[in-house]
Amino acid sequence: MITTATRWPSPAKLNLFLYINGQHDNGYHELQTLFQFIDLCDHLTITPNDSGEITLSPPIPGVEKKDNLIWKAATQLQEHTLCPLGAHIELEKILPIGGGIGGGSSNAATTLVALNFLWDLNLTNKELADLGVTLGADVPIFVHGFSAFAEGIGEKLQPANPKELWYVLIKPEVSIATVDVFSHPELIRNTAKQPLNVLLSASYENDCEKIVRRVYPEVDYQLSWLLEYAPSRLTGTGACVFAEFINEKEAQHVFSLIPDNATGFITRGRNTSPLNQALEEYKSLCNI
């Protein structure tokens, strides 16, 4: 067991497109989506110990410990492997909550991947992903760590290699719960499934965007503003919206014009997760 503190990235993702093809009786939706990581990250500093306890800092406002995905991921990993070890986990929160960029799922995945290494558990990525999907449908993509085309409820992954563009990401002054969008009676749920090559050659869209723009005027305003400058879309169920650019200079120019009431970021697409890169670096340091 490594006993020193190590720092792990917990990256955001974008849904470059998102199509909803149907709904299961259990409420989950059939979808087709293209995930890409971005280099905007939370960070987890993890210090393993032999206490058997999982402690967290700082608390996330409005989130009880038992509902914290970091704590749930760590305790689930303990229980699955009968691991007697513990850890203190400190979260540096950058990613906006309720933004549709996978912050909570990414935190859970980083916890699973990091503790699997730090506790020397040797679970495969598939085993970690199978644990993670019980915490959230997006957790497997963060565990596997490659950009991917996803089907099913998001768990069927096929590696993909979209262009690593620059993005201006805006978080409107509203947080959106995924369940509120997916349960809306007017949400599009019958988009026909298409082969990946057809989807990649068409213009990218998000089936959640129409209803989100209508229900949340803050999203509509920021997306309308971005569309004046570049191709722009909602990611996931929102609230974050993004515009895409070929180079950093163009992104920087539009970023400089963002309205004062908006929270924005410049970021770049990454087809290999920063988490994967960190894991390989730690393995190299430990001669694994």
UniProtKB/Swiss-Prot annotation:
This is 4-diphosphocytidyl-2-C-methyl-D-erythritol kinase. The gene is ispE. ATP binds at P96, I97, G98, G99, G100, I101, G102, G103, G104, S105, S106. It comes from Aliivibrio salmonicida (strain LFI1238) (Vibrio salmonicida (strain LFI1238)). Gene3D superfamilies: 3.30.230.10, GHMP kinase, C-terminal domain (3.30.70.890). Keywords: ATP-binding, Isoprene biosynthesis, Kinase, Nucleotide-binding, Transferase. Disulfide bonds: none annotated. Coiled coil: none annotated. Pfam families: GHMP_kinases_C, GHMP_kinases_N. HAMAP family: IspE. Catalyzes the phosphorylation of the position 2 hydroxy group of 4-diphosphocytidyl-2C-methyl-D-erythritol. It comes from the Bacteria. SUPFAM superfamilies: GHMP Kinase, C-terminal domain, Ribosomal protein S5 domain 2-like. Its EC number is 2.7.1.148. The lineage of its organism: Bacteria, Pseudomonadati, Pseudomonadota, Gammaproteobacteria, Vibrionales. The active site is at K13, D138. Belongs to the GHMP kinase family. IspE subfamily. GO terms for molecular function: 4-(cytidine 5'-diphospho)-2-C-methyl-D-erythritol kinase activity; ATP binding. One of its GO terms (biological process) is terpenoid biosynthetic process. PANTHER family: 4-DIPHOSPHOCYTIDYL-2-C-METHYL-D-ERYTHRITOL KINASE, CHLOROPLASTIC. Pathway: Isoprenoid biosynthesis; isopentenyl diphosphate biosynthesis via DXP pathway; isopentenyl diphosphate from 1-deoxy-D-xylulose 5-phosphate: step 3/6. It is an enzyme of class 2 (transferase).
